[in-house]
């Protein structure tokens, strides 16, 4: 599919199936702009209206001018749900817009977190806590791209829906950390910057380098917006000298 074409519908979410039921049936991977961003918007919209949803937590870095995400979060708070939103005020070129959105969310009753001192929160996470027959279940959306329905039609990004409890526990820990409640000592599945991510990447690069030295299968495949950390670059270059034909870096 070419970018000039309309984004393809996500097969799992066709036929107007309940979005939570779909996620319970299995994780769903999204690749934008080739796949529609609608399921992401609908995820928040349905959570806002669902009487069994207890809480919604989300990080916002950059949103569209008439954001359906903001509208859904405000509606959720007005419907009596616990809504916590981190609005990053240091998002370059969007500082003023984000202040406006933050005030709108606060007015609707959302608990707004204005980022962490000395850090820029760039992660894109949504956590929905839902009451079900089997107990409380956590639904998570993780993404590389902003919760921006306009740029999602232009930028290449990935996202995933899951209700895997390991991700739910990690997402809860992230929001507790952003809220200042606690700092987790370990993670189930997520790798979180700035404390844990760099060392983890370096250890993974070193592992592949050691495998290459031993003649074992070795591969590094990475996709990123930019690469500027000297140690990561040095490790990657060192590895490519060993097995250049098995390294893929997409910038």
What are the language-model segments listed below?
Residues 1-5, 240-249:
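Conserved small/polar residues in nucleotide/adenosyl-binding loops
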Residues 4-220, 229, 237-238:
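N-terminal localization/anchoring segments of enzymes in phospholipid and broader phosphate metabolism
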Residues 224:
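Short, small/polar-rich loop/turn modules that mediate ligand/substrate recognition or access, typified
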């Amino acid at each position: 599919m070419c970018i000039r074409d309309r984004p393809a519908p996500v097969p799992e979410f066709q036929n107007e199936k309940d979005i939570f039921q779909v996620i319970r049936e299995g994780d769903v991977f999204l690749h934008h702009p080739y796949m529609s961003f609608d399921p992401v918007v609908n995820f928040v919209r349905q959570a806002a209206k669902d009487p069994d949803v207890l809480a919604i937590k989300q990080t916002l870095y950059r949103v569209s001018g008439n954001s359906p995400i903001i509208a859904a979060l405000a509606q959720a708070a007005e419907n009596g749900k616990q809504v916590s939103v981190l609005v990053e005020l240091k998002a370059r070129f969007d500082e003023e817009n984000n202040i406006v959105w933050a005030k709108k969310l606060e007015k609707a009753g959302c608990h707004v977190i204005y980022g962490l001192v000395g850090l820029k929160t760039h992660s894109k996470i949504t956590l929905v806590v839902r009451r079900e027959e089997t107990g409380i279940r956590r639904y998570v959306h993780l993404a590389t791209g902003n919760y921006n329905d306009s740029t999602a039609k232009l930028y290449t990004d990935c996202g995933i829906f899951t209700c895997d409890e390991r991700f739910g526990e990690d997402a809860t820990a992230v929001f507790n950390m952003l809220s200042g409640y606690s700092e987790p000592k370990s993670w189930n599945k997520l790798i979180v910057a700035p404390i844990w991510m760099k060392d983890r990447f370096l250890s993974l690069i070193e592992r592949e380098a050691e495998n290459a030295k031993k003649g074992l299968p070795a591969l590094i495949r990475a996709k990123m917006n930019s690469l500027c950390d000297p140690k990561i670059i040095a490790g990657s270059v060192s590895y490519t000298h060993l097995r250049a034909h098995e390294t893929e870096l997409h910038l």
